[in-house]
């Protein structure tokens, strides 16, 4: 190849790479019932779903349920403004439900004795695009942490207890 072709080819490849769409992502700030920041959750598209990276602090130790809820509101102290679980397909609750589960259902995570949790979860039933399963649909959603572990089957919320932290998911 001639020396002048290599820079032109490199420029063309760089333009193609940088013009590709980047994966959608967003950060969510979580607050407790008193309005205090208890951490950040990073969301990004991964495969056919959304990766959920938790960086949390000042939470009660133990296992906790976590779900995407349908309404982008987090009015304390009970966070009921977040509405029910995100459920665009009208299914029952629980990853172990024989009838399918809410799109917003996820596995439990554990908070350590110091009140911290750094964990990565995944929700294969949601996305960050623009269809009915998008966490951004209808103006957004909320992500809610519950006081107890989700039993993965009891409708409508897995007996996971009170809502103890909440963050709004928007673009």
Describe the residue ranges of each PLM region:
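Bacterial N-terminal signal peptides that target proteins for export
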Residues: 1-10
